[in-house]
Swiss-Prot record:
Keywords: Cytoplasm, Ribonucleoprotein, Ribosomal protein
Protein name as it appears in the record: Small ribosomal subunit protein eS1
Origin species: Syntrichia ruralis
InterPro entries the UniProt entry points to: Ribosomal_eS1, Ribosomal_eS1_euk
Keyword DNA damage: no
Pfam families associated with the record: Ribosomal_S3Ae
């Protein structure tokens, strides 16, 4: 039997072994700065790369990031609120953001739903004093009356309390700018006012929340106003946040 060469052993690889390069080594890191109404000025970091004529800082403008309010406020009780921040300007390695929406987590919404009660929802489109057009969604649930034994449904005539809910939301939003309005969302100022009204109104309510806020239209970018919103920010390290779609 003739002994020949084993081609599988003698054959070498073309080009040799390639050098492994870390893809993040060529990227720039930017600190995402949340407005100072949150307890953590630095809410996360974002990496981006400059390639050819494409500048990394230009690619960050108008990006929308989503972060849990619990991370911004250092308060786990606020974990059910999701805040959207939009990048408005890039200064050096800092990305200055502004409020761009709010929503509830799915598990929080499901936990509010109970048997033997009515869900009442209302929404309005309003314009703030600084010309932000926003859409506010409110939810509330009927509360059991003392003389009721089991269920506490609101009849069709009593569902008209939506009109009063809209009136309160419009009144609170039209008399302040975006910064002041966002400050009302976290302590649930509008929801508490609706609860106070319902004690004198048609039907008792419970679990009244502003569950969602959408920015429909923003005014023309003004750097001076953005700096007024941010003021002086510190270098506190924040939590990672993920990018969200700008739609919805």
């Amino acid at each position: 039997m003739a002994v020949g060469k084993d081609k599988r052993i003698s054959k070498g690889k073309k080009g040799g072994k390639k050098k492994i390069v870390d893809p993040f080594s060529k990227k720039d890191w930017y600190d995402i700065k949340a407005p100072p109404r949150s307890r953590r000025a630095r809410s996360g970091r974002r990496c981006h790369r400059t390639a050819g004529t494409k500048i990394a800082s230009d690619g960050l403008n108008f990006r929308v990031f989503e972060v849990s309010l619990a991370d911004l406020q250092n308060d786990e009780d606020q974990a059910f609120r999701k805040i959207k921040l939009r990048a408005e300007d890039v200064q050096g390695k800092n990305v200055l953001t502004n409020f761009w929406g709010m929503d509830f987590t799915t598990d929080k919404l499901r936990s509010l739903v109970r048997k033997w009660q009515s869900l009442i929802q209302a929404h309005v489109d309003v314009k703030t004093t600084d010309n932000y057009q926003i859409r506010i969604f409110c939810i509330a649930f009927t509360k059991k009356r003392p003389n009721h034994t089991r269920n506490f449904y609101a009849q069709s005539s009593q569902i008209a309390i939506r009109r009063k809910m809209r009136e309160i939301m419009v009144k609170e939003a039209q008399t302040c700018d975006l910064k002041e309005l966002v400050a009302k969302f976290i302590p649930e100022v509008i929801g508490k006012e609706i609860d106070e009204w319902r004690s004198q109104g048609i039907y008792p309510l419970q679990s009244t929340f502003i569950r969602k806020v959408k920015i429909l239209k923003a005014p023309k970018f003004d750097l001076m106003k953005l700096m007024e919103v941010h003021g002086d920010y510190n270098e506190e390290v924040g939590a990672k946040i993920r990018e969200a779609s700008s739609r919805g």
